[in-house]
């Protein structure tokens, strides 16, 4: 069985972070492992508190995973401080990690900040050069490219600038501010658009986490980057279309929408 590692924060309400990643990786057919960068006290309405892992404990987690079950792909999500980013980058280089997907999480769906200001530059310097692909949304893409993004032409310019500057593929997600759900992949000097239907569902907590971990899962299984993005977008469309409605704010998706079998059946007695 192929394996994938999520390096990310814990979401106490289960819709984003490592909880979303474990569900997504499992539903996409790989064995999920986790390294926790931070504990968050959050729900669908916002983030109440963040407790970071220490750099030393983060290193212990990474070593424990890589020395026993080497991951076929790595997804990196919320990493809130420069010290933690440096530990991750050093350990990934040390072990020769492959198929690295970086979701540069800066702000939660609820609007709460998840990254310290100085950590953004450290992420750019340390993690982007190691990445197979990064998956910024429009606001994150503006920060990484130093360009305003308001159209598809802007997306193409920004993705090219990010990819050429940092030497990684870029999946720039068009769901924020651009009036469709189309995403742009810039890889190997080529542009590829992925069309997506906009689903009228306000419950989008954890969509970025889910997409990036689905891409990592498919890379782990040997699909090309383009195929992995296509399959990941199909999966997230299914999870959104299931119309799960939980919580008082932007609720989670139904990650297990395609779960079948005896143990998934509801009690009808």
Model-predicted regions and their roles:
Residues 29-33, 192, 218-232:
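Phosphate-handling active-site elements
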Residues 117-191:
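Conserved phosphate/ATP/ADP-binding segment of small-molecule kinases
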Residues 49-52, 226-269:
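Charged C-terminal helix
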Residues 14-30:
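N-terminal basic/disordered segments at the start of proteins
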Residues 7-13, 191-205:
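Short pre-catalytic strand/loop immediately N-terminal to key active-site residues, enriched for Gly-Thr
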Residues 19, 142-143, 201-225:
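Short, small-residue alpha-helix embedded
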Residues 86-94, 168, 182, 190, ...:
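Nucleotide and nucleotide-moiety/phosphate-recognizing core
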Residues 3-6, 26-109:
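Conserved N-terminal subdomain of the carbohydrate kinase-like
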């Amino acid at each position: 069985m192929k394996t994938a590692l999520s390096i990310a924060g814990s979401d106490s309400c289960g819709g984003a972070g490592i909880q979303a990643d474990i569900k997504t990786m499992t539903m996409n057919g790989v064995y999920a492992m986790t390294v926790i960068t931070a504990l968050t006290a959050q729900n669908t309405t916002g983030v109440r508190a963040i407790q970071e892992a220490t750099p030393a404990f983060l290193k212990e987690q990474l070593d424990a995973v890589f020395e026993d079950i080497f991951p076929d792909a790595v997804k990196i999500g919320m990493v809130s401080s420069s010290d933690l980013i440096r530990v991750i980058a050093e350990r990934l280089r040390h072990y020769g990690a492959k198929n690295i997907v970086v979701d540069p999480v800066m702000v939660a769906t609820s609007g709460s900040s998840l990254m310290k200001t100085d950590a953004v530059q450290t992420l750019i310097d340390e993690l982007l050069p190691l990445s197979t692909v990064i998956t910024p949304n429009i606001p994150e893409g503006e920060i990484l490219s130093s360009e305003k993004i308001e159209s598809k032409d802007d997306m193409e310019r920004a993705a090219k600038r990010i990819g050429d500057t940092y030497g990684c593929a870029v999946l720039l997600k068009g769901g924020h501010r651009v009036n469709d759900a189309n995403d742009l992949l810039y890889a190997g000097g080529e542009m590829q658009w992925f069309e997506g239907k906009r689903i009228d569902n306000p419950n989008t907590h954890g969509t970025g986490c889910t997409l990036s971990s689905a891409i990592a899962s498919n890379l782990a299984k040997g699909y090309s980057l383009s195929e992995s993005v296509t399959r990941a977008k199909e999966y997230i469309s299914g999870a959104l279309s299931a119309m799960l409605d939980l919580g008082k704010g932007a609720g989670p998706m139904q990650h297990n929408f395609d779960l079948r079998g005896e143990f998934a059946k509801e009690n009808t007695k």
